[in-house]
């Protein structure tokens, strides 16, 4: 059994007789595919990894079909960082910079004055949006406050990013009191203390079963079947073309003339190029 079998997987687990539940996720290929088409500074890569892990853990709490968007907006050199994830663990991320960012910049140095916005969007029903002030040193601490405020449940988040065997990796754990409140108040504190001892080489380089045994070998832990985590952008020629149709014919003709008769629409998330000439644009109009 090798650790790779649990790369890009999310596990849920339950502590028997403790009324506490947990989640563990590790993103390897899904994280590297997010970074492949961009040249983000290390500090931005790490922040996106943290946000991807947080989004994966958040979407795992959904009890309906839908998606969650975790977004940071600020007035610093990092203008925007955005991650979107679905209940089926399809995830995508992007960042927009408006200044120089060094590899050792802190969250607040990158963001300046900013907010963290979490949008929960079920396929059916109303959206819910929560706004979190970025007044703590790390995104993890800000998100813990969000959980306790929005769900009023004690929550612990562990999020780590870095490299393992020369490849980028992001991983994390969530520990949360069950809503029924049937356990002892000390149960969560006991398990949180154990969880906090996890090392990078364990969360990056062990299978979920091995890591959970190391942390909680005296506990009864029920582990559920994993979900695969995948990078999925969702862009298409149709979506890119729809954006062009919002532009007037006169302006389109001008753009086509400036670009030798072909407009290059590049997806900001995955970097895919979609090319449209006048014939392709006319066909899109006929399909409206």
From Swiss-Prot:
SUPFAM superfamilies: Hsp33 domain, HSP33 redox switch-like. CDD domains: Hsp33 (cd00498). Its main location: cytoplasm. The keyword Transit peptide does not apply. GO terms for molecular function: protein folding chaperone; unfolded protein binding. Gene3D superfamilies: helix hairpin bin (1.10.287.480), Hsp33 domain (3.55.30.10), HSP33 redox switch-like (3.90.1280.10). GO terms for cellular component: cytoplasm. Redox regulated molecular chaperone. Protects both thermally unfolding and oxidatively damaged proteins from irreversible aggregation. Plays an important role in the bacterial defense system toward oxidative stress. NCBIfam families: PRK00114.1. HAMAP family: HslO. This is 33 kDa chaperonin.
């Amino acid at each position: 059994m090798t650790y790779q079998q649990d790369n890009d997987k999310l596990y849920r687990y339950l502590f028997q007789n403790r009324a506490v539940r947990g989640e563990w996720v590790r993103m390897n290929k899904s994280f590297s595919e997010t970074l492949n088409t961009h040249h983000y500074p290390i500090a931005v890569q790490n922040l996106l990894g943290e946000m991807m892990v947080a989004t994966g853990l958040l979407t795992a709490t959904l009890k309906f079909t839908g998606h969650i968007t975790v977004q940071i907006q600020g007035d610093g050199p990092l203008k925007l960082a955005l991650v979107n994830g679905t209940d089926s663990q399809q995830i995508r991320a992007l960042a927009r910079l408006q200044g120089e960012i060094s590899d050792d910049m802190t969250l607040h140095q990158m963001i300046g004055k900013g907010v963290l916005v979490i949008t929960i969007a079920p396929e059916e029903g109303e959206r819910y949006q929560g706004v979190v002030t970025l007044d703590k040193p790390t995104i993890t601490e800000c998100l813990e406050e969000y959980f306790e405020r929005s769900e009023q449940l004690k929550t612990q988040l562990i999020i780590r990013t870095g490299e393992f065997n020369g490849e980028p990796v992001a991983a994390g754990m969530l520990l949360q009191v069950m809503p029924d409140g049937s356990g002892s108040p000390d149960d969560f504190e006991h398990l949180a203390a154990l969880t906090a001892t996890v090392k990078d080489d364990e969360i990056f380089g062990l299978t979920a079963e091995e890591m959970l045994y190391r942390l909680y070998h005296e506990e009864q832990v029920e582990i559920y079947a994993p979900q695969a985590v995948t990078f999925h952008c969702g862009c298409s020629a149709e979506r890119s073309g729809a954006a062009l149709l919002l532009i007037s014919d006169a302006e389109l003709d001008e753009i086509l003339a400036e670009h030798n008769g072909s407009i290059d629409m590049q997806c900001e998330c995955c970097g895919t190029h979609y090319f449209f000439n006048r014939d392709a644009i006319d066909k899109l109009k006929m399909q409206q």
